[in-house]
């Protein structure tokens, strides 16, 4: 079991003054059934959830979960760390990508992701990751869906590939990890920045500066649950409900109240993903 999954649950946050979505989590990795997780989230004002796949089985699970639960939509892809293994598995590269393309066409699947580049880990060679990233960009454009990016220690290459390949209408940098300069580069291209619990960490003043630097229409919040629990729940099991803490941190970084931030984030999510 992952260390994150062995942690104790966090108490419910104070409910938000209005509802917002958790724009990125992994419901398939949560402990226990989905229903109670969604109920806890709703009590905290997190009324909708985007559950995200990292390989074919978890992407299929995400699509099925979204079809079953009205408050859930899905994103499907091969995570960059899984690309080499996927290419070596049944169906090979083209067969796996065809399965992702089929899932991306489903109406409750609203994004292709998480895809991108991860140069922090060496699970897949960089050239393999770049090839799969380009293929996912093509799938997102063909399906008319948003592109949800995993970018770790790869800012320049991610931006270069998006520019060279041609980005879809909506691009989301999941768990944005760049500084203010990177945020401004993304904003110039119209890319959306989704902030996770890392925004609340004492060690992340650069993230808060980035969150304050971009236009409000380019902001989302997420949990990446069950990972990256925000302050004051660090060390606990993350869950979609805890996006309420990150929403308040985002509001504070921008110098506005939580109600105004809720309205902004909810409106942005519907523009990027469509209504649900």
Give the positions of each predicted feature.
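Mid-domain alpha/beta scaffold segments of enzyme catalytic cores
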Residues: 1-276
């Amino acid at each position: 079991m992952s260390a994150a999954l062995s942690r104790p649950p966090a108490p419910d946050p104070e409910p938000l003054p209005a509802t917002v979505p958790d724009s990125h989590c992994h419901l398939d990795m949560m402990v226990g059934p989905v229903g109670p997780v969604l109920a806890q989230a709703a009590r905290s004002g997190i009324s909708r959830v985007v559950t995200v796949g990292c390989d074919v089985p978890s992407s299929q699970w995400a699509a099925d979960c979204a079809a079953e639960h009205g408050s859930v939509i899905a994103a499907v892809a091969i995570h960059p760390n899984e690309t080499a293994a996927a290419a070596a598995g049944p169906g090979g590269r083209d067969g796996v990508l065809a399965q992702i393309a089929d899932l991306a066409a489903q109406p409750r699947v609203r994004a292709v992701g998480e895809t991108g580049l991860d140069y922090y880990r060496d699970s897949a060679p960089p050239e393999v990751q770049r090839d799969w990233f380009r293929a996912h960009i093509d799938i997102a454009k063909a399906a008319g869906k948003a592109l949800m990016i995993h970018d770790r220690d790869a800012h320049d290459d991610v931006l270069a590939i998006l520019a060279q390949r041609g980005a879809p209408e909506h691009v989301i940098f999941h768990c944005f990890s760049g500084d203010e300069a990177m945020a401004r580069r993304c904003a110039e291209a119209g890319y959306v920045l989704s902030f996770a619990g890392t925004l609340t960490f004492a060690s992340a003043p650069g993230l808060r500066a980035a969150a304050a630097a971009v236009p409000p229409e380019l902001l989302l919040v997420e949990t990446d649950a069950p990972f990256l629990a925000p302050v004051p729940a660090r060390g606990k099991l993350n869950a979609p409900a805890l996006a309420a803490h990150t929403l308040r941190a985002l509001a504070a970084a921008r110098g506005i109240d939580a109600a105004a931030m809720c309205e902004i984030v909810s409106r942005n999510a519907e523009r990027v993903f469509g209504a649900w």
